């Protein structure tokens, strides 16, 4: 099931803009202190580095991703999630707007 709405959170008003505007996100904080980000990646192939482990949840569009140390591109679409280890990196290839929630930790 795709997350369509997130209630009861605090939203950081200023956007995080990466890769010359190809990725734009906003941080959200839940009442228990849990942090996530919601955003969109526009058509591009990008490499992201992680500090903490991440789960990427697709809420619209599609992508292909490749985890560090692997050679295979894996498709991910609406309703799909993929996990990225902490202190790692992943490549993401997007041909249409990819809307996501990034779950940290």
From Swiss-Prot:
It holds the Pfam family Ppnp. GO terms for molecular function: guanosine phosphorylase activity; purine-nucleoside phosphorylase activity; thymidine phosphorylase activity; uridine phosphorylase activity. GO terms for cellular component: cytosol. It is an enzyme of class 2 (transferase). Keywords: Glycosyltransferase, Transferase. CDD domains: cupin_PpnP-like (cd20296). It catalyses: a purine D-ribonucleoside + phosphate = a purine nucleobase + alpha-D-ribose 1-phosphate; adenosine + phosphate = alpha-D-ribose 1-phosphate + adenine; cytidine + phosphate = cytosine + alpha-D-ribose 1-phosphate; guanosine + phosphate = alpha-D-ribose 1-phosphate + guanine. SUPFAM superfamilies: RmlC-like cupins (SSF51182). Its EC number is 2.4.2.1, 2.4.2.2. Belongs to the nucleoside phosphorylase PpnP family. Catalyzes the phosphorolysis of diverse nucleosides, yielding D-ribose 1-phosphate and the respective free bases. Can use uridine, adenosine, guanosine, cytidine, thymidine, inosine and xanthosine as substrates. Also catalyzes the reverse reactions. This is Pyrimidine/purine nucleoside phosphorylase.
């Amino acid at each position: 099931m795709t997350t369509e709405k997130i209630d009861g959170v605090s939203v950081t008003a200023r956007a995080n803009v990466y890769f010359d505007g190809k990725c734009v996100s906003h941080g959200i904080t839940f009442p228990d202190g849990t942090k996530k980000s919601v955003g969109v990646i526009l058509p591009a192939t990008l490499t992201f580095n992680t500090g903490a482990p991440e789960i990427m949840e697709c809420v619209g569009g599609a992508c292909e991703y490749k985890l560090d140390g692997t050679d295979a591109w894996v498709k991910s679409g609406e309703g799909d999630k993929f996990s990225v280890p902490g202190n790692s990196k992943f490549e993401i290839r997007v041909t249409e707007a990819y809307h996501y929630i990034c779950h940290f930790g």
